[in-house]
Amino acid sequence: MIFISQSGITDHTREAQWDQWYIEHLRIMVTVPGISSAQRFKADTPGFPPSLAIYSITSPAVFTDPYYLSVRGMGEWLPLIDRRHYRRNLFEGLEHAPLAADDARLLVADRLQPQDAIGGIEWIWLKSVGLDCSTPYRGIAVVAAAKLPALAETVAVYRPVTPRMSKDSD
């Protein structure tokens, strides 16, 4: 299963501090039983949530785990979260989040139904099954940044800002 959290903050003067906090947050999240990987991205496309984190999880039971409940959330950042961009969705359709290297981009397209092709790219379609369910389906694709095609304005382009972290990461 895939858990995707999208957000942004209202005080952009604190963006560097937010970025540092998020690195530690991801490190903690991959210590939760049932979370095997986490990676954070920032939007290169205006009009979309500025920050996206993608997690590989074993099941929705992760969200009721006592340890998860003790470490989840935004902590001191909660009052600064821009609610226009705050979305948490749980998806089925993929066991592990795709790896996006530094020179790749994560493409995200929310749709009512899966589509065969968008921009000539092969998409993985995820079905929303829990939490906010802000979209029925989310298409994701990882492409080389150098080969990024022209895309519709309804497709978000995200660049990785952390490596994919896992229980085996340093």
Residues of each region from the PLM?
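Macromolecular interaction modules
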Residues: 1-170
